[in-house]
C-alpha cells in the first residue's frame, strides 16, 4: 500500500503478522482511492506518515489494552493516528473530556491540560480506529473503502495470537467490531460511547480504568499509568529537553 510518493511503513512486529493484508485487492483499491482524493486536493487526515501511528507506538507484543474507535477527527490539525487523541495545543475534544472525567472520578487523577495520549500508547494501550483516514470537515468520508477489513484483521489477530488482553469497547460500533473477541481468552469491558450524547447513559461511572489495572495486576503485569504529563512537561520532552 502506498500513499503520496512514498510507501507507508508498518511497524515490523505488526508487519510480520498483518502486513500481508495490505497486499489484498481491497487495500490496493483503498490506496488508489487515497491517491485520487489527494489529487483532487482533498485534505486527508492524518498526514500519511501518521496513518499507522497506533502501530508504531504500540508494537504487537507490547499490547496490553485495546481501545477501539471509529474514524479520525476531521478538524484541521486534530488527527495524528491514535483514536481519541489530539496533538498538543489542539483543544481537547468533548469525548476525550468525558474520558478524563471518568478517569478523575474512578482513580482521582486530575484532568490533563491537553489531549495527547501518546504516553498511554507507549505503555501498551493500542488506540485503534476502525477507519484510519478521513477528509477535512467530512466525518466518515472514508468508511467502507477498505480500512474496516484491515482493522478487523488486526483485532482477529490479537484475539488469536495474544492472551489476557483488555478490550475497551465504548459504543455500539466498537462493540459490534469486537464481537469476534474470545472472552474466555481476553477481558472485555463495554459501555456507551463517551460522546456527550451518550456518556451519561453508563460511560460515566463505568470504572473501566481501575478495572483494567486490576485485571493486568492479577496477570502479574504492570498497571497503566492513566495520568498524563502537563502540557509544559510534554512540550519540553517533545523538544528534547
From Swiss-Prot:
User: Which GO cellular component terms are attached?
Assistant: cytoplasm
Sorted alphabetically, which SMART domains does this protein's record hold? UDG, UreE_C
> What Enzyme Commission number(s) appear in the record?
3.2.2.27
**Where located?**
Cytoplasm
Q: Name one Pfam family in it.
A: UDG
Its source organism is Xanthomonas campestris pv. campestris (strain ATCC 33913 / DSM 3586 / NCPPB 528 / LMG 568 / P 25)
Major localization listed first in the record, in broad terms: cytoplasm
What is one process in the GO biological process aspect for this record? base-excision repair, AP site formation via deaminated base removal
Name-wise, this protein is Uracil-DNA glycosylase
Its recorded reaction(s) are: Hydrolyzes single-stranded DNA or mismatched double-stranded DNA and polynucleotides, releasing free uracil
Instruction: Please explain the role this protein plays, according to its UniProt record.
Output: Excises uracil residues from the DNA which can arise as a result of misincorporation of dUMP residues by DNA polymerase or due to deamination of cytosine.
Gene for this protein?
ung
Q: Which Gene3D superfamilies match?
A: Uracil-DNA glycosylase-like domain
Q: Which PROSITE patterns match?
A: U_DNA_GLYCOSYLASE (PS00130)
Q: Which InterPro entries match?
A: UDG_fam1, Ura-DNA_Glyclase_AS, Uracil-DNA_glycosylase-like, Uracil-DNA_glycosylase-like_sf
Where does the record place the catalytic residues? 71
Q: Does the keyword DNA damage apply?
A: yes
Query: Belongs to which family?
Result: Belongs to the uracil-DNA glycosylase (UDG) superfamily. UNG family.
Query: Could you tell me the keywords of this UniProt record?
Result: Cytoplasm, DNA damage, DNA repair, Hydrolase
Annotated GO molecular function terms are: uracil DNA N-glycosylase activity
Enzymatic class? hydrolase
Amino acid at each position: 500500500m502506498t500513499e503520496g510518493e512514498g510507501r507507508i511503513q508498518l511497524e515490523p512486529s505488526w508487519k510480520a503478522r498483518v502486513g500481508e493484508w495490505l497486499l489484498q485487492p481491497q487495500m490496493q483499491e483503498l490506496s488508489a482511492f487515497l491517491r485520487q482524493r489527494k489529487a483532487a486536493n482533498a485534505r486527508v487526515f492524518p498526514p500519511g506518515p501518521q496513518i499507522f501511528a497506533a502501530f508504531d507506538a504500540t508494537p504487537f507484543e507490547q499490547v496490553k489494552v485495546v481501545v477501539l474507535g471509529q474514524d479520525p477527527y476531521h478538524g484541521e490539525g486534530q488527527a495524528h493516528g491514535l483514536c481519541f487523541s489530539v496533538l498538543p495545543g489542539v483543544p481537547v475534544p468533548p469525548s476525550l473530556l468525558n474520558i478524563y472525567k471518568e478517569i478523575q472520578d474512578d482513580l482521582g487523577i486530575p484532568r490533563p491540560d491537553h489531549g495527547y495520549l501518546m504516553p498511554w500508547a507507549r505503555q501498551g494501550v493500542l488506540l485503534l480506529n476502525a477507519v484510519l483516514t478521513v477528509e477535512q470537515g467530512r466525518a466518515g468520508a472514508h468508511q467502507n473503502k477498505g480500512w474496516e477489513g484491515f482493522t478487523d484483521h488486526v483485532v482477529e489477530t490479537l484475539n488469536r495470537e495474544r492472551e489476557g488482553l483488555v478490550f475497551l469497547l465504548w459504543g455500539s460500533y466498537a462493540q459490534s467490531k469486537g464481537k469476534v473477541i474470545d472472552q474466555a481468552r481476553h477481558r472485555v469491558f463495554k459501555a456507551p460511547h463517551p460522546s456527550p450524547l451518550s456518556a451519561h447513559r453508563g460511560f460515566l461511572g463505568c470504572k473501566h480504568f481501575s478495572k483494567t489495572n486490576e485485571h493486568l495486576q492479577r496477570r502479574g503485569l504492570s498497571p497503566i499509568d492513566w495520568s498524563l504529563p502537563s502540557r509544559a512537561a510534554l512540550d519540553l520532552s517533545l523538544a528534547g529537553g
